[in-house]
């Protein structure tokens, strides 16, 4: 296909995003590919940024990362001493209503990333976003464990 005919083909389906396949041809992107591309952009914007100055970017990132999952995931966002993002890590996966979280593993992960501060994250695929007593207890347990190694918990979302 010539560049001229390629351009007319593209304009005829301008409502779709296109991706290049392994043969070099363009085809409409699958929804999962669009989400992956958006996630890569948001991860790039989030990494190395001032975490607390862009709460909307964090919400957008987490909505794309966790919003469509049918099971609970517990993740952490590692921050440096200036609260810039070091890394986002999904640590534990569970069922639709529960995911086991092991404080020892969270502490090990924080030390491995040389984390100064951390944001704790988990989704609620059941639709109930209010923190349960178990969530509140877990937050306190993790705060206590992480404080022993000088890692400050910024938030639990």
Question: Where in the sequence are the language-model features?
Answer:
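Active-site-proximal loop/helix of nucleotide/amide-processing enzymes and allied scaffolds
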Residues: 2-35, 57-60, 82, 92-157
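Long amphipathic N-terminal alpha/beta scaffold segment
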Residues: 29-91
């Amino acid at each position: 296909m010539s560049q001229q005919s390629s351009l007319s083909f593209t304009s005829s389906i301008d409502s779709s995003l296109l991706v290049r396949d392994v043969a070099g041809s363009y085809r409409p992107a699958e929804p999962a590919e669009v989400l992956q591309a958006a996630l890569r952009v948001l991860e790039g914007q989030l990494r190395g940024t001032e975490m607390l100055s862009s709460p909307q970017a964090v919400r957008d990132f987490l909505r794309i990362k966790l919003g469509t999952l049918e099971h609970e995931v517990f993740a952490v966002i590692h921050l440096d001493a200036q609260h810039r993002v070091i890394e986002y890590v999904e640590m534990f996966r569970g069922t639709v209503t529960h995911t086991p979280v092991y404080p020892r593993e969270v502490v090990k992960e924080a030390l491995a990333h040389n984390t100064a501060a951390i944001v704790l994250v988990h989704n609620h695929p059941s639709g109930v976003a209010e923190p349960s007593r178990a969530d509140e207890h877990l937050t306190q347990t993790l705060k206590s464990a992480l404080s022993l190694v000088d890692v400050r918990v910024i938030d639990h979302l």
